[in-house]
């Protein structure tokens, strides 16, 4: 009986300790700040209006505003937005564009989703590279300057410098400087690689500048 009594006493003693000190510790647990959202860049240039949205809500962007991992960045009508990610990568968005920063390790690459609008990405070579996902294609980048977005009524990809791989509908093409491809609709394969005409290049770059 003494052994059973000792076990019971220990049990009730443990419960009293947990109730007393657990209650004291609870406010400190509740008040402990949530893990900070990771900042991956900032706004360099803005014409018109732009917004960013994540789990914390929606906010207006202006020059020098921070950009965080998980942000979905959106531009307004006739607006232009320039973002610097880390030290070596810049992203320019044109009219009514939407870009989500899904993953990004500063100056080491990442993954972004372009839902709409035109984009111009300029980056130095990354060991891991950058992937741009869209409803039309997946674009794999390793240090390049390229355009992606609406062009001549289609989704076009054009390389200004470097090289990218464009994959869609289980097919892929590799573009090098001066070359482009089109995806006519979501689910369609990329068209054969060809050099874009100067007027088309100018129109594409003007849509993000």
Q: Which residues make up each language-model segment?
A:
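Twin-arginine (Tat) signal peptide motif
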Residues: 9-19, 32-33
